[in-house]
Amino acid sequence: MDLKEQIVEILNTIIGEDISDQMDDDFFENGLLDSMATVELLLDLESKFNIQAPVSEFNRDEWNTPNKVVAKVESLIG
Protein backbone atom coordinates (compact mmCIF):
# COMPACT_ATOMS: atom_id res chain seq x y z
CA MET A 1 0.00 0.00 0.00
CA ASP A 2 1.47 3.37 -0.98
CA LEU A 3 1.53 6.49 1.18
CA LYS A 4 -1.62 7.99 -0.34
CA GLU A 5 -3.60 4.76 0.19
CA GLN A 6 -2.42 4.53 3.80
CA ILE A 7 -3.45 8.12 4.51
CA VAL A 8 -6.85 7.63 2.85
CA GLU A 9 -7.36 4.53 5.00
CA ILE A 10 -6.62 6.56 8.16
CA LEU A 11 -8.98 9.31 7.01
CA ASN A 12 -11.72 6.81 6.16
CA THR A 13 -11.47 5.35 9.66
CA ILE A 14 -11.59 8.72 11.41
CA ILE A 15 -14.33 10.18 9.23
CA GLY A 16 -16.35 6.98 9.09
CA GLU A 17 -16.88 6.96 5.35
CA ASP A 18 -14.92 6.41 2.14
CA ILE A 19 -13.45 9.72 1.03
CA SER A 20 -11.26 8.32 -1.78
CA ASP A 21 -13.41 10.06 -4.40
CA GLN A 22 -13.32 13.38 -2.50
CA MET A 23 -9.58 14.06 -2.58
CA ASP A 24 -9.97 17.82 -3.09
CA ASP A 25 -13.02 18.34 -0.87
CA ASP A 26 -12.56 20.47 2.25
CA PHE A 27 -13.03 18.38 5.42
CA PHE A 28 -13.93 21.36 7.54
CA GLU A 29 -16.38 23.05 5.16
CA ASN A 30 -18.15 19.71 4.68
CA GLY A 31 -18.31 19.01 8.41
CA LEU A 32 -16.27 15.80 8.13
CA LEU A 33 -13.59 16.78 10.67
CA ASP A 34 -13.93 18.68 13.92
CA SER A 35 -11.18 19.67 16.33
CA MET A 36 -11.12 16.31 18.13
CA ALA A 37 -10.97 14.38 14.86
CA THR A 38 -8.17 16.66 13.69
CA VAL A 39 -6.11 15.87 16.77
CA GLU A 40 -6.80 12.16 16.23
CA LEU A 41 -5.67 12.49 12.60
CA LEU A 42 -2.43 14.22 13.55
CA LEU A 43 -1.66 11.63 16.24
CA ASP A 44 -2.39 8.73 13.87
CA LEU A 45 -0.18 10.25 11.15
CA GLU A 46 2.65 10.88 13.62
CA SER A 47 2.48 7.30 14.83
CA LYS A 48 2.14 5.66 11.43
CA PHE A 49 4.78 7.69 9.57
CA ASN A 50 7.12 8.68 12.41
CA ILE A 51 6.67 12.39 11.75
CA GLN A 52 6.17 15.43 13.96
CA ALA A 53 2.95 17.36 13.29
CA PRO A 54 2.33 19.36 16.47
CA VAL A 55 -1.20 20.60 17.01
CA SER A 56 0.30 23.96 18.05
CA GLU A 57 1.72 24.39 14.52
CA PHE A 58 -1.40 23.12 12.74
CA ASN A 59 -2.50 25.37 9.88
CA ARG A 60 -5.97 24.33 8.77
CA ASP A 61 -5.41 25.60 5.21
CA GLU A 62 -2.51 23.16 4.80
CA TRP A 63 -4.51 20.13 5.98
CA ASN A 64 -8.08 20.71 4.76
CA THR A 65 -8.29 18.18 1.91
CA PRO A 66 -7.06 14.60 1.54
CA ASN A 67 -4.60 15.67 -1.18
CA LYS A 68 -3.19 18.38 1.09
CA VAL A 69 -2.79 15.88 3.93
CA VAL A 70 -0.84 13.58 1.59
CA ALA A 71 1.37 16.48 0.42
CA LYS A 72 1.98 17.67 3.98
CA VAL A 73 2.92 14.19 5.20
CA GLU A 74 5.26 13.75 2.22
CA SER A 75 6.96 17.05 3.08
CA LEU A 76 7.34 16.04 6.74
CA ILE A 77 8.80 12.65 5.83
CA GLY A 78 11.54 14.32 3.86
UniProtKB/Swiss-Prot annotation:
Localization: Cytoplasm
Highest taxon in the source lineage: Bacteria
The record's account of how the chain is modified after translation: 4'-phosphopantetheine is transferred from CoA to a specific serine of apo-DCP.
GO MF terms, alphabetically ordered: D-alanyl carrier activity
Keyword Phosphoprotein: yes
The keyword Cell wall biogenesis/degradation belongs to this UniProt entry's keyword annotation: yes
Main location: cytoplasm
GO terms classed as biological process: cell wall organization; lipoteichoic acid biosynthetic process
Sorted UniProt keywords: Cell wall biogenesis/degradation, Cytoplasm, Phosphopantetheine, Phosphoprotein
Membrane-crossing segments per the record: none
One GO cellular component term: cytoplasm
Family indicated by similarity: Belongs to the DltC family.
Function summary: Carrier protein involved in the D-alanylation of lipoteichoic acid (LTA). The loading of thioester-linked D-alanine onto DltC is catalyzed by D-alanine--D-alanyl carrier protein ligase DltA. The DltC-carried D-alanyl group is further transferred to cell membrane phosphatidylglycerol (PG) by forming an ester bond, probably catalyzed by DltD. D-alanylation of LTA plays an important role in modulating the properties of the cell wall in Gram-positive bacteria, influencing the net charge of the cell wall.
Protein name per Swiss-Prot or TrEMBL: D-alanyl carrier protein
Lineage, highest ranks first: Bacteria, Bacillati, Bacillota, Bacilli, Lactobacillales
Gene designation: dltC
